[in-house]
Every structure is written in C-alpha cells, then in structure tokens.
Amino acid sequence: MARILELGCSIVISYKDGYIHPDMKRLFYRNKQLAKDFQKCALPLLGACLFWGIGFTSYSSFMGHLGVDAAAANSVAAVVRDIICCFSAGISSAAGIMVGNELGAGNLRRGKLYGIRLLKISLVCGVMASLLMLVTAPIILHFVNLTPQAAGYLKGMFGVIAFYMIGRSVNDVTINGIFGAGGDTMFDMYSLAVCMWCLAIPLAALGTYYFHWPVVVVYACTCIDEVGKLPWVFLHFRKYKWVKDLTH
C-alpha cells in the first residue's frame, strides 16, 4: 500500500512546473539505441539486486538455524542497522544526482572532484554512524524485551554493526551513487558475487552447519562482505572508469 501511494504522489507531483512527467504518447515508443544503452547499465544492476536479495535471505536462514534467541536478536539488529543505514542511503542518492548531473553536462573534471569529495564524506558518515551505534546500543538494549541470552547476542551484534557501518557507508555512496552515475554498474555485481557469495555466505554457512561457531561470530561473517570489499572499492575508484558522459 505504501508503494502504491508513493507512486501516485510521484505521478501527481511530476505534473507540476519544473518536473518531467510521463508522456503517454511516447510511453511505449521504443528507441533501439536507447534500449541498448539502458540494458547495458540496467542488466548488471538487476543481477546485483538478485545477488543481494537472495544473499540477505540466506543470512536470515543461518540465524534461524542457530535458535530462537539468535533469530530474535538478529531481527532487532536488522531493524536498527537499516535505520542507521538511512544516512548513507540518502548521501548515495545525492551523490548519484550530483555526479551524474556534472558528467551528463560534460563537466568531467568537476564530476570527478565531486566524486572524490563525496567519497571522503562517506568515510566521515560511516564513522559517525559507527559512533551513533555505540552510543545508542545501551539505550536500545534497555528498551527491548529479550531473554538474557538473546540480549547478549544483540549486544555483540551491535558491536559488529559499528564496524560494518563504515564499510556500508563507503560502499553505498561509492558503488550505488558515484559508480552508478557514470554507468559503471558491472562492479556492483562483481563485488557481490565475490565478497558476498564467495566469502560471506560460505563462511557463515560453514560456521552455522559445520564448525558450530558462536552466534556473534556467524553474524560477523554475514557482515564481512561490506568491509572485505573496501580495498577493492578504493582501487576501482582510483581507476576513474566511472568518469564518463553517458549522454554521448
């Protein structure tokens, strides 16, 4: 229902002055070149979304296998993590608009400078989100109604999230915002295939079903992909393959 209302509001607002609104006459018009360019950028994003969605679902199954207390703690941790991630998600959207606008206007040098500055901002945002997690953790633990065992798991998970947020912030802004603005969408799919499906999921699965690691250690394995891909992200960023004008 929320998404339907959001779509309706977006369509209504799009007909106001200064906005681009749907043109029903051209809605089903097919431009072969535009479709080709769109598929080149969109298909890797579709693959990345599939990798990410299925991967996160498997994380929940690991926690569920570890018991009721682990599943309960993971549910609370997921909500808190998603709320804090709103900071990086907002900056990511802004980064895509700012960098994409400059690159599309042909201002490649300015777009590159914006990308560098936004990367630095994402680092600061990640550190702030990490500190926010550490500060609010005792307050959240005070208000949630969990068993002592689940509360202990949740406390450890909050510590993991504090480190996780630094990687998540940088990756959100850089991969989803800056790289996406320049059409460099293949990196997102590759990084998820390697760091999530070849690292995080196998480690978490082994820890859950074979080695029987502690709950917090398995949870840390499910978060290792965001931190593990950081060196790769920085290296790819400095290649500046994303500095290109997609309108030509």
Task: List PLM regions with ranges.
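Short alpha-helical transmembrane segments in multi-pass integral membrane proteins
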Residues: 1-43, 99-165, 206-248
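Hydrophobic/aromatic residues within the transmembrane alpha-helices of Major Facilitator Superfamily
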Residues: 8, 50-54, 83, 87, ...
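Hydrophobic/aromatic residues in alpha-helical transmembrane segments
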Residues: 10, 55, 59, 95, ...
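Core transmembrane alpha-helical segments of multi-pass membrane transporters/permeases
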Residues: 33-62, 90, 94, 123-126
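Helix-terminus/linker motif at the lipid-water interface of multi-pass membrane proteins
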Residues: 46, 50-83, 101-102, 141-148, ...
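Small-residue-rich hydrophobic transmembrane alpha-helices
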Residues: 60, 73-137, 169-191
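Alpha-helical transmembrane segments of multi-pass membrane proteins
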Residues: 80-84, 148-174, 194
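C-terminal structured "cap/appendage" subdomains that terminate the fold
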Residues: 178, 186-198, 205-213, 217-220
